[in-house]
Swiss-Prot record:
Protein name in UniProt: Lipid-A-disaccharide synthase
Disulfide topology: none
UniProt KW Chloroplast keyword: no
Alphabetized GO MF terms: lipid-A-disaccharide synthase activity; phospholipid binding
PANTHER family, sorted: LIPID-A-DISACCHARIDE SYNTHASE (PTHR30372), LIPID-A-DISACCHARIDE SYNTHASE, MITOCHONDRIAL-RELATED (PTHR30372:SF4)
TM spans (from-to): none
Pathway: Bacterial outer membrane biogenesis; LPS lipid A biosynthesis
Function: Condensation of UDP-2,3-diacylglucosamine and 2,3-diacylglucosamine-1-phosphate to form lipid A disaccharide, a precursor of lipid A, a phosphorylated glycolipid that anchors the lipopolysaccharide to the outer membrane of the cell.
Taxonomic classification: Bacteria, Pseudomonadati, Pseudomonadota, Gammaproteobacteria, Alteromonadales
Enzyme Commission identifier(s): 2.4.1.182
Family: Belongs to the LpxB family.
Amino acid sequence: MSKPIRIGMVAGEPSGDILAAGMVAELKRQYPDAIIEGIGGPNMIDAGFHSLFDMETLSVMGLVEVLAHLPAILKVKKQLLAHFEQNPPDIFVGVDAPDFNLRVEKALKARGIKTMHYVSPTVWAWREKRIHKIAKAANRVLGLFPFEQQVYDKYHVPYTFVGHTMADAIAIEPDQNAARQELGVESNAYVLAVLPGSRRGEVETLLPVFLETIEAIHVKRSDIQFLIPAANEHRLAQIKAFLQEANNAEERLPIQVTQGTSRDAMIASDVILLASGTATLEAMLCKRPMVAAYLLSPLTYKIMQRLYKAPFFTLPNLLANEAIIPELLQEEVNAENMSNQLLNFFESDNSALIARFTDLHHTLKCNADKTAAKAVVEELFA
C-alpha cells in the first residue's frame, strides 16, 4: 500500500487561516489520507489540519511587537524545521506571513523539498527586488490578484492566479434587505457604514476625523443613519469609549455600533466610509460606493513616498487600473472633503460604478479553494 501524501503548511495569522482552510478541505476531499501539518488556526484544524504549534506565536503586528516576540518565533521555526527533517513533506505551502514563511521555504527547498508560497508579497507596490528572495524560496507563487502576474513574468518566476476566496463567498447581488433585517435597520433608510479599521492604532487615528465627517453629514442630511461595525470586542470597547467622550455621540447622533458584523453592515449600507486595506475589496464585492482614507505618521509617509511604486493604494483602483473610488491620504483626510464625496454618492446614480465592481467581482471569482488545491497537486506530481 502506498504511503499517504504529506503536505507541510504554515499560516501565521487569522486571515491566512481562513484562506488556507478551504484549500485544506479541498485537498482532504481529494486525498482523505493525506497528512497536512504545520502551523494553522481553528478554521484549518476544523478542515482536517494538524497544527504542531499555536498560530498565536506568529500573529504579531508591528516592528516593536515582532522584536519582543522574536525569541519565541525563532524557537518555533527551529522546532518546525526539525520536525520536517524527521518527517519530510512531499510539498510545503507557506500561506502569507512572508517574513516567516519565505525563510522556512528556502530552508526546505535547499533540502530538495518542493515549496509554494500562497499570497504574493506586495512586490508590485514596493521593494520589487524582494522577488529574487521569493524565487530562491518558492517553486511557485499562488496569487490573489491578476495584476500581480506581470511582475512575476518580468522576473521569470512561476506564478498562478487563483482568485480570492472572498469573491467566492460574497453573492454577485448581495441581499440588502436581509442584511438590514439582521441589523434592525429600516428597509427604506439611508445608511452610511463607517469602518475605521481593525487595529487599535487605525481606530485611534481615523475615528476622530470619521466622527467629524459623520457630524458634517448629519448637519446637511439628518435622514442618514450611521452603522459602525467593530472588528472585535476590543475595538467595540474602544469605539464606544471614544464616542462617549465625544459628547456622547452615540446618543446625540443616529449612530448604531455593532460587533463582528462588518459584512452585514456593508451590505445593509448605501455608501461606505472606511480605512484603506482588505476592507476596500470587501466593500467592492458588496457593490457599495465608498471613500477610502488612511493616515500615516509623517515619517512613515515620507518613507513610503520614496518606496511605493504603484499608482494607487486601494485594491478596487489597483484592480481597475484607474481611480474608480476616491482614495484619500494625509491632509486629504478631513471632514469637509470626505463628507462632500460621500454625500455626492448619496445624491448620484452609481450604476456605472456598481457595474464596474461587478465585472471585477467576476474576475476574482475563480473558486479559489479548488484552484489553489489543484495548483498544489500539479506541483506535487510535476
